[in-house]
Regions:
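Alpha-helical transmembrane segments of integral membrane proteins
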Residues: 7-11, 52, 77-85, 148-152, ...
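Membrane-water interface at transmembrane helix exits
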Residues: 36, 72, 93-101, 141, ...
Length: 193
């Protein structure tokens, strides 16, 4: 029998996926695209875009792997379960990307400018960067970090997601799904502790 402290976070991730797929409903999809366009075209000060560019590091695969290795070194008893949860979250995101195949906003809408130096080659749904950042923010809570650090990590995860929409790499519902997959996966792992 699966314990509630594992099942409920898994349901959170599933809810993120299903609600994220609401972009397939025409009116919701139009609203998602409009919001992506508005965020992408908003006049922000240069420092804000530079900050979002730096913050994006928190969603990269290399940063994700480095933090997971450091966590496993700090708490060896976490290593196997943490690795399994992280691999499961990555696999879910990748499987959804190859199955759903949602085009990137910058490729689907000429009004959206790609604000990245490297053009992403995979599909848009879900945002794996948002998933990784959310996973790591949940890890700060599970690791017993002070409340301010947990809040800062959660704000960083939301910032990574906002930056992905701002950059033209994702729609808001891609980010929403990625955040909930990441939170769900790390909370499911934490439920096994």
């Amino acid at each position: 029998m699966i314990a509630a402290d594992v099942l409920l976070p898994a349901c959170l991730a599933l809810f993120g996926i299903v609600s994220g797929l609401l972009w397939k409903v025409p009116n919701v999809g139009r609203l998602d695209a409009l919001l992506a366009q508005r965020v992408n075209q908003a006049h922000l000060p240069g420092w804000a875009d530079r900050f979002l560019g730096v913050l994006r590091i928190a969603g990269t695969t290399l940063f994700f792997a480095a933090v997971l290795v450091l966590a496993a070194i700090a708490r060896p008893s976490w290593a196997l379960g943490l690795a399994a949860a992280a691999i499961a979250a990555e696999a879910i995101a990748k499987l959804l990307k190859v199955t759903i195949r949602r085009p990137r906003p910058s490729a689907a809408d000429s009004g959206i400018m790609l604000r990245l130096t490297r053009v992403p080659i995979d599909s848009s749904f879900p945002s794996a960067d948002a998933m990784r950042a959310a996973f790591l923010s949940g890890l700060t809570a599970a690791g017993g970090m002070p409340g301010w650090a947990v809040l800062a990590a959660m704000a960083a995860a939301v910032g990574v997601g906002f930056g992905r929409v701002r950059s033209g790499a994702h729609y808001p519902l891609d980010v929403w799904a990625g955040l909930l997959i990441g939170f769900g996966a790390v909370l499911a792992w934490a439920g096994t502790l």
